[in-house]
Regions:
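A recognition module on extended beta-rich or small alphabeta surfaces enriched in W/G with H and D/E
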Residues: 202-204, 213-262
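A surface-exposed partner-binding patch
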Residues: 1-219
Length: 262
């Protein structure tokens, strides 16, 4: 796919622009991971290499690797000037100044619904700061993708996908407007009962649930940051459910975005 064709059609919620390697400043070029440069310059042959990296670094999401191997058109770069959680930062106050300008990795993939010329998935720079205390909980689900390849994996046009480490809130922060702290009952998915009432004493501790992935309509998936065993909680604020294999549930969400239902 031609660069100019992608640039004309490229859009995003992060005020992002599609960039060529030659468009980068000297500082941006120096800060870019070497593997990114290799993938960008490999053109339409990047799919196999990308899939191999995913299988190595994020082994619990094999269907994502399979999709990328078959449907990655090419890898590119984007200069993004607003993080995808700027609205949440405004709500919480202490994150309101989190705006950044950075070069991000862009996956240009086929739109299997044939609605748009392509879909764009964005991964931010690998996380190089001191890892948070709850990192092992996230790592048990998503492996080393965020620290070794790129941080986060978000569909460009929506807040959907794997969150970057700095953007992982607790569930109580994420649903600050949705969860009533004084309620005595919470309605969740429980087996075949769509909205089973769970008494307060059986609620999870929302302040200990760290959100690592998001979908549409306030759907979220979270690890219990006191555990590192690929378990967690997920779905919506009024349909929350315990999950025994969190990676599989997150992969289902990503595949819903990537692969049309037949």
């Amino acid at each position: 796919m031609k660069f100019d064709e992608i640039r004309r059609s490229f859009y995003g919620t992060w005020h992002a622009t599609y960039q060529a390697l030659d468009d980068l400043t000297a500082q941006e070029a120096r800060g870019m991971p070497a593997i990114w440069r290799e993938l960008v310059t490999s053109g339409d042959e990047a799919g196999e290499a990308v899939a191999s990296l995913w299988r190595q670094l994020c082994p619990r999401l094999p269907r994502v690797a399979d999709f990328l191997e078959e449907n990655l058109i090419q890898v590119g770069l984007s200069r993004m000037t607003t993080p995808h959680h700027v609205v949440r930062g405004f709500q919480l106050g202490d994150r309101a100044g989190y705006d950044t300008t950075e070069i991000a990795l862009v996956y240009i993939t086929r739109d299997l619904d044939h609605v748009v010329p392509f879909n764009a998935w964005i991964g931010r720079q690998p996380f190089r700061q001191e890892l948070p205390a709850w990192w092992d909980s996230v790592r048990s689900v998503l492996g080393d993708l965020a620290t070794e390849f790129h941080d986060g994996f978000m569909l460009d046009s929506w807040e959907q996908g794997l969150l970057a480490i700095p953007d992982m809130p607790t569930m109580s922060e994420l649903w600050i407007d949705y969860v009533d702290p004084d309620a005595e009952m919470m309605y969740v998915h429980r087996e075949a009962d769509y909205q089973a009432a769970v008494p307060r004493e059986q609620w999870p501790d929302f302040s200990q649930l760290r959100v690592i992935a998001e979908g549409t309509t306030n759907r979220a998936w979270a690890v219990d940051q006191r555990r590192a065993d690929n378990t967690g909680w997920g779905d919506g604020a009024d349909t929350l459910a315990p999950i025994s294999d969190l990676a599989h549930s997150i992969e289902d969400m990503l595949c819903e975005l990537m692969i049309p239902r037949t």
